[in-house]
Amino acid sequence: MAQKQKCVAMLLAGGKGSRLSALTKNLAKPAVPFGGKYRIIDFTLSNCANSGIETVGILTQYQPLELHNYIGIGNAWDLDRVSGGVTVLPPYAESSGVKWYTGTASAIYQNLNYLSQYEPDYVLILSGDHIYKMDYSKMLDYHIEKEADVSISVIEVPWDEASRFGIMNTNEEMEIVEFEEKPQFPRSNLASMGIYIFNWAILKEYLEMDARNPESSNDFGKDVLPLLLDEGKKLMAYPFEGYWKDVGTVKSLWEANMDLLRDETSLNLNDRDWRIYSVNPNEPPQYIAEKAKVEESLINEGCVIEGDVKHSVLFQGVTVEEGSMVIDSVVMPGAKIGKNVVIERAIVGSEMVIEDGTIIRPEKNVDDVVLIAEGK
């Protein structure tokens, strides 16, 4: 029996991320590069470390190899513990064969034995594909104070975007009275962030109940939460007011990177009190040539800049040759940009080679974002 834990986190990291197109052709969405030196999953894992959550199960499925290698034993996030720490939980084979995760609830259900060994009081369920900084310990305090069965973190979204999210309708005490999955005509703009705290006994009971239902899609939002409400359980909404971004599309991923370049951004990567940790390769210092120009940009180690870079994010090992211009763009690790190239409002994938004289920018709608990546 493992040492008892007050709270165990379960991080859902098996998503395909098909809306990110070629960026996730051979890569799980949580492993997609972000912010010049990070992966998307770094934010959730760093939140766990900074919040004092010491036991994290990471549930993987789609294209897991690079993600598994990246996570390792969790030492980058100080989660390499003798008791607890990080455990990667892919689908596994039973006597009846391999059982793939069929939904978010299915993924947790198939790992109830992992949770049981810690006898937790609470289980924190997280998504590995959002960009945000959050103190989960404050949410846990709120959950305990409200004597909730389940607490769900919510954020106000613009009304014209509310139909894209799972929406929580609450009373004045922030108790959830109704959950609507992507409603056509929303009555609230409180969107679920996909962050849940369950009392362990409640989670176990309702996941087992859901698994016995042949008509269930085994999803928290579509099946488990509505069932809890129908049976009169106490679900509380926990309001979050910081930066949070669902980077599930090419444009939203680009927007989140551009947010880092604002003079005043609520996503401060220089916050020494809430560091974002990552696994970084050893690279030499960046080199910026005499005639190069760099403005309002994040330039990581190992970059060689001989052209112009303006309001852009460049990951490690990127080369920008003489006469080239990179504007309002994200260039992922190891990309090589030749001479006299123009790149504007684009994401250039890892290890891409852009030939001399190439022009890359939106052709029809100036508000679009161009993706240049393998398989595109």
UniProtKB/Swiss-Prot annotation:
Catalytic activity entry: alpha-D-glucose 1-phosphate + ATP + H(+) = ADP-alpha-D-glucose + diphosphate
Domain of life according to the entry: Bacteria
SUPFAM superfamilies: Nucleotide-diphospho-sugar transferases (SSF53448), Trimeric LpxA-like enzymes (SSF51161)
Matches recorded under CDD domains: ADP_Glucose_PP, LbH_G1P_AT_C
Pathways per UniProt: Glycan biosynthesis; glycogen biosynthesis
Enzyme Commission identifier(s): 2.7.7.27
Keyword terms: ATP-binding, Carbohydrate metabolism, Glycogen biosynthesis, Glycogen metabolism, Nucleotide-binding, Nucleotidyltransferase, Transferase
Subunit structure: Homotetramer.
Biological function: Involved in the biosynthesis of ADP-glucose, a building block required for the elongation reactions to produce glycogen. Catalyzes the reaction between ATP and alpha-D-glucose 1-phosphate (G1P) to produce pyrophosphate and ADP-Glc.
HAMAP family: GlgC
Recorded family membership: Belongs to the bacterial/plant glucose-1-phosphate adenylyltransferase family.
Classification via PANTHER family: GLUCOSE-1-PHOSPHATE ADENYLYLTRANSFERASE, GLUCOSE-1-PHOSPHATE ADENYLYLTRANSFERASE-RELATED
The protein's name: Glucose-1-phosphate adenylyltransferase
Species name: Bacillus thuringiensis (strain Al Hakam)
Gene: glgC
